[in-house]
């Protein structure tokens, strides 16, 4: 059936901020869908609260709303835009849940809007655990023995029933809440106490207060099938995926391999037929789904775990692994096409989309964790997802792609590095999976354990264990050799197994440089193969490439052109401190330079992103972003310029080495990047410009640090040099804390010194993004942070334009920014962080740090001002001046845009959610309003902090915050919210003549604050404490209780003031489209 003509306007719901379990794969699918539907002549309206996405670029959809994704707000957009249909399958769980809410509240009916891509019935049947189980039984597929519970009593009854059916004693047992994402709130319980804890949390987090309690399948094998089905019942399997880690670990936290490696042909056909039966029964007939299976290795019993009736993390992986654009195809199926009518773009239309992709290589995905940011979190892997990003690699064999993926992770390893030689530690680590288990598996074989012994501890399939054992055995042989004694054939064999130059250098006690020179001399070089969906049966016209070491005269398919090329280095895996914002910049660089007639080359290894989409750049190399891999590509392609300032710290770390190897880096020079990063050089630069910095010193030993600290005076910010995301930063108030820090943090510093800065109390922090062509400096935007200095800039909310600074201060910030940009000869982007302290009625400006690269605020500033800074800066790097691009005056919008950070604390119950100098947010949202208050309120709503319409507010603040707390209390009282406060705070509020009730601090006896939070007596909590370790520890129970009981809380007085500002706007919400806002500038 050709496309439908009865619908004209389609609303796409995005996925919102990046959280654990829902990352930038939905930006990739949403951007694809917008493109696909506009190609077909539909008008596309998009809503997404995340400004760091490509899909919210004003050019991606026809009308773009950066607004909170709640059904009430989306209803306003529907009323304004009157779409004919909603496509809810591109925005992950957020979009599905929002679409179901619209359905339940009668909004779809009221405005006569149809859901396309998946019907409410199909979504419900797939997402509602009980209905799904009944559907599976109906088509004769097994599912785990389980039951549904809506209360703790029911849950215990189900558990007892399963214990009787499975004769397993009833533990371990798995708990899965309905309609949540990435297994949120779920887990595995090994005893009754754990069971009750997990059930209570799960009931609370499930929007339908429903749990599925099921038998434990720990140790079973897990597989996924990516399936696409159309109205005519054409079905194709895009890709089979096998989890290296057995059941019991969320698939998002597992190492996965495609295509599945350990299935026999017969088993594969059984899974294939089963997955098609599942789609038919659930009723998915216009798009993609992923179906997860589990197989008991003992007796072959197969069961269906779950299916997602939408584009998912796995489908992004399958798209990148095969080159088959699932999201684009699913969007076209949703408007009536069938698979045989669509062409496969990769083969230039030589094959229809109804051909199943076949691949002649192996793909390995490895997750990236961020537990170093959450030392109190439980790092054991269970059914609740905890990873923050992932790396994908391709090779001709499992070993090659596996070792490439490990070095692409950027966790300080070059392959299967040694973790430990302590037998007890190794046995414990392989038995209880944590983020490093794969390296401990290598250590187990180094100890001499057999495959059977390791299998007994881990339940990892013996085929994978044999591959890992072989890598370890090979390493032992290499250790006994010298580099000179290796023949070309031996070296090639090692490279075919995926060993990196650096790993070989470590094993043979030499340098990576020496290994590289030997390789070049012996002509052992990689060849590049194309991803073509058809195992090279048809010619492909897209250059989507990966490296591999083949036999001596292996055919290289790179086939470089003679055009002028610019190469962009991507940011590698998502992590806290380096996320989608950097990918956004890389994509914009590729798009801008492509428009200008350069051939663009992208190098990256993150499968979730738009940058690794085969049609973002002219040529895509899906490779780890390491020196060895980048130098080989440069040698092949010979670009005229390489951009390193867009991918965050990942490419920057390579800048000096690349330059030393003759790679043409364009934009700000690596030497100047170093001048800004190196403490002593930067100090001299500021001194020459006559700019202020907080008093600071550099210490190289503990005793020296204590002496220097006394010179500056406490409180201090201490940190190692060269960090991103504030890793290992702390605010210390006394020598005792500093001693402890020096003992613990020297581990972090790799012989690099520790930096001490005077901490500026009660300062306002600001960010300025600017760009320069080497002559003129253009200010992109000045942002004022809402949280005070001392909260990491990535975790602070901020406003553009500033909401409280005087024009004179803003002008001074711009003057200082321009002076530094000139002194550093910046070509491209630069970001400066300032702190402003009031002394005697005057604003004193201090420079905190300068980053001569793209910063994480670039996408937000671009959305707020309507100028794509990353595009303009990329053109500057390629030699176009600002005048030639017609960029003259800074844009200061007449409306406010507020960016707010989003945190993963609900995934890590043990972690204290207090904000500090370490960055811990995973994503961001933006709110737009005519006033600062309106924009702020929307940013809170979008970040999931519900501001209550009524109810009691608790205030407990440190002494220095009391004057401002009185103002907050006065507004609350005027708005009609009753106030309770702890003794000290209450007497200050009372003295100002505002009614308040006194409550007990936790140490003053019961009933105290935490009891009130647990009993649901409080609607909002404002709690601020001194930055001392003791004060933070004392008050921790208030914050964790508020978090656990889902009471909205603010831990800074600035946040509290902002929240109260937002409370004034509860009733009247307006929605604004980006195109309309930009047109008004």
From Swiss-Prot:
Residues 945-1081 form the MGS-like domain. Mg(2+) 3 binds at residues 833, 849. Residues 133-335, 683-878 form the ATP-grasp domain. Mn(2+) 1 binds at residues 292, 306. ATP 2 binds at residues 719, 758, 760, 765, 790-793, 833, 849. Its cofactor is Mg(2+); Mn(2+). Pathway: Amino-acid biosynthesis; L-arginine biosynthesis; carbamoyl phosphate from bicarbonate: step 1/1; Pyrimidine metabolism; UMP biosynthesis via de novo pathway; (S)-dihydroorotate from bicarbonate: step 1/3. Mg(2+) 2 binds at residues 306, 308. Belongs to the CarB family. This is Carbamoyl phosphate synthase large chain. It comes from Ralstonia nicotianae (strain ATCC BAA-1114 / GMI1000).
């Amino acid at each position: 059936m050709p496309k439908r003509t009865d619908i004209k306007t389609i609303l796409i719901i995005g996925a919102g901020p990046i959280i654990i379990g829902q990352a930038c794969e939905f930006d990739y699918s949403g951007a694809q869908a917008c493109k696909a539907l506009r190609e077909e002549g539909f008008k596309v309206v998009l809503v997404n609260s995340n400004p760091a996405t490509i899909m919210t670029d004003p050019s991606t959809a026809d009308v773009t709303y950066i607004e909170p994704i709640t059904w009430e707000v989306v209803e306003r957009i529907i009323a304004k835009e009157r779409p004919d249909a909603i496509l809810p399958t591109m925005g992950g769980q957020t979009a599905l849940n929002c679409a179901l809410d619209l359905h339940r509240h009668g909004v779809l009916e009221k405005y006569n809007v149809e859901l396309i891509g998946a019907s409410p019935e199909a979504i419900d049947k797939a997402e509602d655990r009980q209905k799904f189980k009944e559907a599976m039984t109906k088509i004769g597929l097994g599912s785990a023995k389980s039951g549904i519970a809506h209360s703790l009593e029911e849950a215990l009854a189900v558990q007892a029933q399963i214990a009787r059916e499975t004769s397993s004693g009833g533990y371990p047992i798995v708990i899965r809440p309905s309609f949540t994402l990435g297994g949120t709130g779920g887990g595995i319980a090994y005893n009754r106490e754990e069971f009750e804890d997990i059930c209570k949390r799960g009931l609370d987090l499930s929007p339908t207060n429903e749990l599925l309690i099921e038998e434990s399948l720990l140790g079973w094998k897990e597989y996924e099938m990516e399936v696409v089905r159309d109205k005519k019942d054409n079905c194709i399997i895009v890709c089979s995926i096998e989890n290296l880690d057995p059941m019991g670990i969320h698939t998002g936290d597992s190492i996965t391999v495609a295509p599945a490696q350990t299935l026999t042909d017969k088993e594969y056909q059984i899974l294939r037929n089963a997955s098609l039966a599942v789609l038919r029964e659930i009723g998915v007939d216009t798009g993609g789904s992923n179906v997860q299976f589990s197989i008991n290795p003992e007796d072959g019993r197969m069961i269906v775990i779950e299916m997602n009736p939408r584009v998912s993390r796995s489908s992004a992986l399958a798209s990148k692994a095969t080159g088959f654009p699932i999201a684009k195809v699913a969007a076209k199926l949703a408007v009536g096409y069938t698979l045989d009518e669509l062409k496969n773009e990769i083969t230039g239309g030589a094959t229809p989309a109804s051909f199943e992709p076949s691949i002649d290589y192996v793909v390995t995905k490895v997750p990236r964790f961020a537990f170093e940011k959450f030392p109190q979190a439980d790092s054991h892997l269970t059914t609740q997802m905890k990873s923050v990003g992932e790396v994908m690699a391709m090779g001709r064999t499992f070993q090659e792609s596996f070792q490439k993926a490990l070095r692409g992770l950027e966790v300080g390893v070059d392959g299967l590095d040694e973790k430990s030689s302590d037998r007890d530690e190794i046995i414990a680590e392989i038995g209880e999976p944590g983020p490093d288990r794969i390296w401990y598996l290598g250590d187990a074989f180094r100890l001499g354990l057999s495959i059977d012994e390791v299998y007994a501890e881990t339940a990892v399939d013996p085929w994978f264990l044999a591959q890992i054992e072989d890598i370890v055995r090979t390493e032992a042989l290499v250790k006994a050799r010298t580099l000179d004694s290796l023949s070309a054939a031996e070296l090639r064999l090692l490279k075919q197994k995926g060993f990196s130059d650096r790993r070989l250098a470590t094993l043979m006690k030499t340098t990576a440089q020496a290994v590289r020179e030997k390789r070049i001399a012996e002509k052992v070089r990689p060849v590049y193969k194309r991803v073509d969906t058809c195992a090279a049966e048809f010619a492909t016209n897209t250059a989507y490439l990966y490296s591999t070491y083949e036999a001596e005269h292996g055919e290289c398919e790179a086939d470089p052109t003679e055009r002028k090329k610019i190469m962009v280095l991507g940011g590698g895996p998502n992590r806290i401190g380096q996320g989608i914002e950097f990918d956004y910049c890389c994509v914009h660089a590729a798009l801008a330079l492509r428009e200008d007639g350069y051939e663009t080359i992208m190098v990256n290894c993150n499968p979730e992103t738009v940058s690794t989409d085969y049609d973002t750049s002219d040529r895509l190399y899906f490779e780890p972003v390491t020196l060895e891999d980048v130098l080989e590509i440069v040698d092949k392609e010979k670009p005229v310029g390489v951009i390193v300032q867009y991918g965050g710290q990942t490419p920057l770390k390579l800048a000096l080495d690349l330059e030393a190897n003759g790679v043409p880096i364009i934009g700000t020079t690596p030497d100047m990047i170093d001048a800004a990063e190196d403490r002593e050089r930067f100090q001299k630069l500021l001194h020459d410009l006559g700019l202020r910095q907080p008093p600071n010193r550099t210490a190289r030993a503990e005793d020296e640090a204590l002496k220097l600290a006394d010179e500056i005076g406490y409180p201090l910010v201490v940190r190692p040099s060269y960090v991103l995301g504030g890793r290992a930063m702390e605010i210390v108030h006394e020598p005792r804390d500093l001693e402890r820090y020096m003992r613990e943090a020297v581990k972090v510093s790799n012989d690099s010194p520790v930096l001490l800065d005077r901490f500026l109390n009660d300062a306002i922090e600001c960010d300025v993004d600017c760009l320069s062509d080497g002559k003129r400096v253009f200010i992109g935007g000045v942002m004022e942070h809402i949280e005070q200095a001392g909260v990491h800039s990535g975790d602070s909310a901020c406003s553009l334009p500033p909401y409280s600074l005087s024009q004179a201060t803003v002008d001074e910030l711009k003057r200082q920014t321009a002076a530094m940009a000139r002194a550093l000869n910046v070509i491209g982007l630069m970001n400066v962080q300032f702190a402003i302290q009031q002394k005697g009625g005057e604003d004193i400006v201090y420079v905190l740090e300068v980053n001569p690269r793209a910063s994480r605020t670039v996408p937000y500033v671009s959305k707020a001002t309507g100028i794509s800074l990353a595009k303009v800066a990329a053109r500057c790097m390629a030699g176009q001046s600002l005048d030639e691009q017609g960029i003259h005056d800074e844009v200061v919008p007449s409306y406010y845009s507020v960016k707010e950070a989003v945190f993963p604390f609900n995934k890590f119950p043990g972690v204290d959610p207090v904000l500090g100098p370490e960055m811990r947010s995973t994503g961001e949202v933006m709110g737009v309003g005519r006033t600062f208050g309106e924009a702020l309120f929307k940013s809170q709503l979008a970040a999931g902090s519900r501001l209550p319409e009524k109810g009691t507010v608790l205030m407990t603040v440190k002494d220095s915050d009391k004057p401002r707390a009185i103002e907050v209390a006065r507004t609350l009282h005027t708005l009609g919210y009753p106030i309770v406060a702890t003794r000290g705070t209450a007497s200050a509020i009372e003295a100002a003549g505002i009614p308040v009730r006194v409550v007990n601090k936790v140490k003053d006896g019961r009933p105290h604050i935490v009891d009130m939070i647990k009993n649901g007596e409080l609607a909002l909590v404002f709690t601020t404490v001194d930055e001392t370790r003791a004060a933070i520890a004392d008050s921790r129970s208030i914050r964790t209780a508020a978090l656990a009981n889902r009471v909205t809380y603010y831990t800074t007085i600035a946040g509290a003031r902002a929240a109260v500002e937002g409370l004034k706007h509860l009733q009247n919400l307006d929605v604004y489209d980006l195109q309309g806002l930009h047109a008004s500038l």
